[in-house]
């Protein structure tokens, strides 16, 4: 009986050790550690951090109306192409910044308004 008791005690100790080591890392990890976020994880994190607000570069630059209305463009296609150029974030989108490369929460929040 003592052999089976020790075996049970060792098995229970190992089980507790495994549970503690796997769940304990969640609280010790720095939330601002660079991490790859792709797909639904990236989208969920974005919505959670930004609360549905998005980074509108036009508002940041004080544009009250679309570029084609303010500049009197003759071609709507040309106006939209130029406006899309200004809305890019240094040519890098959220997927390139946070999925292709690891990014921090602070970097991800730069895409919020």
From Swiss-Prot:
Primary localization class, coarse: secreted
GO cellular component, one term: extracellular region
Coiled coil feature spans: none
Signal sequence extent: 1-21
Keyword presence, RNA-binding: no
Protein task: This venom insulin, from a fish-hunting cone snail, facilitates prey capture by rapidly inducing hypoglycemic shock. It is one of the smallest known insulin found in nature and lacks the C-terminal segment of the B chain that, in human insulin, mediates engagement of the insulin receptor (INSR) and assembly of the hormone's hexameric storage form. Despite lacking this segment, it both binds and activates human insulin receptor (long isoform (HIR-B)) with only a 10-fold lower potency.
Alphabetically ordered keywords of this record: Amidation, Carbohydrate metabolism, Cleavage on pair of basic residues, Disulfide bond, Gamma-carboxyglutamic acid, Glucose metabolism, Hormone, Hydroxylation, Secreted, Signal, Toxin
Residues recorded with modification Histidine amide: 51
Chain positions listed as propeptide in the UniProt record: 22-29, 52-92
Full protein name: Con-Ins G3b
Record SUPFAM superfamilies: Insulin-like
Entry-annotated residues carrying 4-hydroxyproline: 34, 102
Gene Ontology terms: biological process: glucose metabolic process
Residues bearing PTM 4-carboxyglutamate: 41, 96
Stated family: Belongs to the insulin family.
Species of origin: Conus geographus
Remarks, miscellaneous: Venom insulins constitute about 1/25 of the total venom of C.geographus.
Complex and partners: Heterodimer of A and B chains; disulfide-linked.
Tissue: Expressed by the venom gland.
Disulfide bond sites: 38-99, 50-112, 98-103
Record note on modification: It is noteworthy that in this dimer, in contrast to Con-Ins G1, the chain B is amidated and not the chain A.
């Amino acid at each position: 009986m003592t052999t089976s008791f020790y075996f049970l005690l060792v098995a229970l100790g190992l089980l507790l050790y495994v549970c503690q080591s796997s769940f304990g890392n969640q609280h010790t990890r720095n939330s601002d550690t660079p991490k790859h976020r792709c797909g639904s994880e990236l989208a969920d994190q974005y919505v959670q951090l930004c609360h549905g607000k998005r980074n509108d570069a036009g508002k940041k630059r004080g544009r009250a109306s679309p570029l084609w209305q303010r500049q009197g463009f003759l071609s709507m296609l040309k106006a939209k192409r130029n406006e899309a150029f200004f809305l890019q974030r240094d040519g890098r989108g959220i997927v390139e910044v946070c999925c292709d490369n690891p990014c921090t929460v602070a970097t991800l929040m730069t895409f919020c308004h």
